[in-house]
UniProtKB/Swiss-Prot annotation:
The reaction(s) this protein catalyses: L-serine + acetyl-CoA = O-acetyl-L-serine + CoA
Homology family: Belongs to the transferase hexapeptide repeat family.
EC nos: 2.3.1.30
UniProt GO cellular component terms: cytosol
Protein name per the record: Probable serine acetyltransferase 2
Domain of life of the native organism: Eukaryota
Biological process terms in GO annotation: cysteine biosynthetic process from serine
Broad EC category: transferase
Molecular function terms from GO: serine O-acetyltransferase activity
Pathway membership: Amino-acid biosynthesis; L-cysteine biosynthesis; L-cysteine from L-serine: step 1/2
Length: 354
């Protein structure tokens, strides 16, 4: 407790007199009854919190991390990271019981990359692959790859813009396993391309176990990706997913058998894949296409069209909007500019009905 009565984190001693363990501590509140502290006690709060998380917070020290991260943002700074910090401070005041979690996950870090490394490592660790080891691996990957630093921000923006359940950037970072799955894949993909395939496969296995999402580290996925709900997604080794694609739960981008080589789907920019959609084989789903929930796609889907059913058939065309951005899961006749299927005559499939 600080002299001004503000809420602080206090170290909890075990029988040996050391910190009682990862994430353990108790919240104390002084007679002033304040929320998350004040300027006069900020230093004390930080000092006590750092004592409480001697190894758990940061991994190895990398002094250049913030400077490296700032290399991809313009003179205006890093607005997403600034928003995440502001949101975390506000939430710590509203929910004091989460103060230690928010400090360790966000407020103790100097850039979004470090915060993300911390969050992912503490979700993916196991008894033989420790969080501190993973933090160093993840930091090293992200700090040395401009593409991944750009992608983690564009993905966060995609979650904030397209998922009505994600009201804040910090919610994607801290709580949404769809976001965690995509960023973990991005790290595994970099490791795979560096020739560290065994480590990449170990991460893939752990990601699948923890998040129920199985993305092969060799798959190629663009930026601005929304993986909504983050459960039951499968993306095969030779699959390609373009920029700005939205994928709902239960989507499969799979092969058709035991053949080797290029055997998985290619998804165009701005496509929307509905819940439970299954797309099999080396086929193309065009830019701005929409695959309805529960559909089985075995043939190419034209750009800006909607495919529905099992097996899927093209039912219409919409030229002006990317469904991944509007998130309109809509098969009504009046939604389409052109109708490709007469709903009483499936023989018209694939051609515009005048």
């Amino acid at each position: 407790m600080t002299s001004c009565g503000c809420l602080v984190l206090e170290k909890v001693e075990d029988h040996g007199g050391e910190a009682a363990g990862r994430g353990r501590g108790r919240l104390a509140q002084g007679g002033g009854g304040g929320g998350g502290g004040c300027g006069s006690c900020a230093g004390e709060w930080r000092s006590r919190s750092e004592t409480m998380f001697p190894i758990y917070v940061m991994g190895s020290s990398r002094a250049s991390s913030a400077a490296a991260a700032r290399g991809i943002v313009d003179a205006a700074g890093d607005p997403i990271w600034e928003a995440v910090k502001s949101e975390a401070k506000s939430e710590a005041e509203k929910e004091p019981i989460l103060s230690s979690f928010l400090y360790a996950s966000v407020l103790s870090h100097d850039c979004l990359e470090r915060a993300l490394s911390f969050v992912l490592a503490n979700r993916l660790e196991d008894p033989t692959l420790l969080a501190t080891q993973l933090i160093d691996i993840f930091n090293d990957v992200m700090m040395n790859n401009k593409d991944i630093r750009r992608s983690i921000r564009l993905d966060a923006q995609a979650f904030k813009d397209r998922d009505p359940a994600c009201a804040q950037y910090s919610w994607a970072l801290l709580y949404l396993k769809g976001y965690h799955s995509v960023q973990s894949y991005r790290i595994a993909h970099v490791l795979w391309n560096q020739g560290r395939k065994v480590l990449a496969l170990a991460l893939q296995s752990r990601i699948s176990e923890v998040f129920a999402v199985d993305i092969h580290p060799a798959a190629r996925i663009g930026e601005g990706i929304l993986l909504d709900h983050g459960t039951g997604l499968v993306i095969g080794e030779t699959a390609i997913v373009g920029n700005w694609v939205s994928l709902m739960q239960g989507v499969t981008l799979g092969g058709t058998g035991k053949e080797n080589g290029d055997r998985h789907p290619k998804i165009g920019q701005g496509a929307l894949l509905g819940a439970g959609a299954t797309i099999l084989g080396n086929i193309n789903v065009g830019e701005g296409a929409m695959i309805a929930a529960g559909s089985l796609v075995l043939k190419d889907v034209p750009p800006h069209s909607m495919a529905v059913g099992n097996p899927a058939k093209v039912v219409g065309y919409k030229d002006k909007e990317d469904p991944s951005l509007t998130m309109k899961h809509d098969a009504r006749r009046d939604y389409f500019e052109h109708v490709a299927v007469s709903f009483s005559d499936d023989k018209a499939n694939g051609s515009v009905v005048k």
